[in-house]
Amino acid sequence: VSIGIQDDVASTLAIIEKRLQQGYQRIKLKIKPGWDIELAQGVRAAFPEVMLMLDANSAYTLHDSEYLRQLDDYDLLMIEQPLPYNDIYQHSKLQPQIETAICLDESITTVDDAMLAIELGACRIINLKPARVGGFTESIKIYRFCVENGVALWIGGMLETGIGRSANLAFASLPGVTLPCDLSATDRYYDPDVTEPPFVIRPDSTIATPTENGIGVMVQMDRVQQAVQYCREHLPYSLPIANV
């Protein structure tokens, strides 16, 4: 589960405790310069065994390499997208300077990006978000490349409703997706969702993959209509929304 930047470390620790009680076992924390070392130190002191990763969202530059190296002390699963998303080359310069595995997210939009990143040694892990790369055609290409070349891979989401979430879950269940994925329970973002049944976190920190026909969930058209009506009434711009 992902946790954004909070007011202080104590607030972050409280949220982590809540998420762990809800069943999540892998914690991702957003970081930025000045909100990183102290945060990692505090989390490790409070939760020494938790599976922990940090997501920088391109907040650093290569000049911060010595600073980022300090994060090696906190047994991180990975650091995600530390440098600008459009600079795979700079990531290839950073990865040899730190022990923590770099994971590329926004940098990977095509299989060619993935191939270049691995060839240059810019990362050891790829976060594959089907919506980010244009859908499942390109996702499958990236997935196959990672599996064939032994690249660690996990599946992320982009605030999908149950329609997209069910497809992402099916994709995340493929062999070769080797790391915990960033797919949360339905009520983390939508309550209610436009589909039934909802996705829930099980005691072992997993979500059941849909097994019903089609995408595995049923679209609730009354909720879709409510969402469309809300958008028409409240968004400050008009959307080309078809009648449903």
What are these regions (language model features)?
Residues D75, N86-C103, I108-T206:
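Shared catalytic-loop signature of beta/alpha-barrel
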Residues Q81, L183, E212:
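Active-site donor-binding loop signature of nucleotide-sugar glycosyltransferases
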Residues V1-I98:
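Metal-dependent enolase-superfamily TIM-barrel catalytic cores that perform enediolate-based chemistry
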Residues S2, W154-I155, G162, E212-G214:
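Short glycine/serine/threonine-biased micro-segments
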Residues R188, V194-V244:
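C-terminal extensions of enzymes
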Residues F47, A172-G176, T211:
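Structural signal for hydrophobic packing residues in well-ordered secondary-structure cores
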Residues I5, P33, S58, K129-R132, ...:
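Short loop or secondary-structure boundary microenvironments that flank
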Residues V9, L13, I37, Y85-I88, ...:
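Electropositive phosphate-/nucleotide-binding environments in soluble metabolic enzymes
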